Regions:
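Outer membrane beta-barrel
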Residues: 1-74, 104-107
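Short intrinsically disordered, low-complexity coil segments enriched in acidic
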Residues: 2-7, 197, 213-214
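Outer-membrane beta-barrel and related beta-rich outer-membrane complex signature
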Residues: 26-30, 77-81, 156-160, 209-211
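Detector for outer-membrane/organellar transmembrane beta-barrel domains
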Residues: 95, 100-209
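A short secondary-structure junction signal
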Residues: 27-28, 66-68, 76-81, 114-115, ...
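Solenoidal tandem-repeat scaffolds enriched in leucines and small polar residues
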Residues: 74-77, 81-89, 96, 104-106, ...
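Outer-membrane beta-barrel initiation region
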Residues: 66, 91-93
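Extracellular loop and loop/strand-boundary signature of outer-membrane beta-barrel proteins
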Residues: 35-40, 81-88, 120, 166-171, ...
C-alpha cells in the first residue's frame, strides 16, 4: 500500500493513494495467515485500489463510518475481459467504485458489525452492486462470526460464472449473481488451545440463462 492520510480532526481522517477497499465483512478483515481458504467473492476481489476515502469515528466510541471513491480497475478493460468482452458492451469512461461502510459495537462489545455497500461502474450499462454484512458474536471463551455477501454483476467481473457457461456462451456473462455465507467459530479450551471451525458456501447463477432448467 502507498497512501497518504490526513487527520482532519481527532475522529476524522482523509486518505488517498492506493487504498485497501473497505469491503466489509469479517472474513475480509482477517489476517490472511489466519485464513485457510477464502470464499469466492473475497478470493476473486481486487482489494487494493487507487482512490480517496474519508472515515469518521463517532464520539460514542461504538460506531464508525467510511466512504471511498476508487478506480475500480487494476488493469484495463481489454486486459480484464480480452476476447470475452461482449460485443454489445462498451467500457466505462469512468470505471469507479463507490464504497460505504459502517462498523458498530453493541452490548459492551458482545455484538459487532461491519456492513458495507459498494457500487461499481463496470461498463456502460453494466454495473455491479455488492453488499457485505459481517456479524461478530462474542462470549467468554467463544466467538462466532457470520458474513453474508451478495454481488449482483451486470458484467461478470469475477469470471466464475463465465467459465462455467463458456461452452454455451463465449463471452463474459451478463447479469451474474453471487450469494455467499461464511461462518467461523472459535472456542478457547485453554490458554494455549483454541478450537476453530469454518463453514462456507457460495452460490453462482446466470440470470440471463436462456435455458429455464439450467
Amino acid at each position: 500500500l502507498a497512501f497518504l492520510r490526513i487527520d482532519l480532526s481527532k475522529s476524522t481522517q482523509l486518505s488517498f493513494g492506493k487504498l485497501c477497499a473497505d469491503w466489509g465483512g469479517f472474513e475480509f478483515d482477517f489476517n490472511p495467515i489466519d485464513i485457510l481458504t477464502y470464499n469466492d467473492i473475497i478470493e476473486y476481489a481486487d482489494n487494493f485500489l487507487v482512490g480517496a476515502g474519508v472515515s469518521h469515528n463517532f464520539d460514542d466510541g461504538k460506531n464508525s463510518i467510511s466512504f471511498q471513491v476508487l478506480n475500480s480497475r487494476t488493469k484495463t478493460y481489454e486486459e480484464q475481459y480480452g476476447s470475452s468482452a461482449p460485443p454489445s458492451i462498451n467500457p466505462s469512461e469512468f470505471p469507479l467504485a463507490l464504497v460505504a461502510n459502517w462498523r458498530g459495537s453493541f452490548f459492551d462489545g458482545k455484538f459487532e458489525t461491519t456492513y458495507s455497500y459498494s457500487f461499481f461502474n463496470e461498463a456502460q450499462g453494466a454495473h455491479m452492486n455488492y453488499f457485505a454484512l459481517g456479524n461478530k458474536f462474542k462470549a467468554k471463551n467463544f466467538v462466532l462470526y457470520y458474513d453474508f455477501q451478495y454481488s449482483d454483476e451486470g458484467l461478470d467481473r469475477k469470471g466464475i460464472v463465465s467459465s462455467i457457461i463458456s461452452s454455451q456462451y463465449p463471452y463474459a456473462a451478463q447479469n451474474a449473481l453471487y450469494v455467499e455465507n461464511w461462518v467461523r467459530a472459535e472456542y478457547l479450551v485453554a490458554p494455549k488451545i483454541n478450537l476453530l471451525l469454518t463453514v462456507m458456501n457460495s452460490n453462482h447463477s446466470w440470470k440471463d440463462n436462456p435455458d429455464p432448467n439450467g
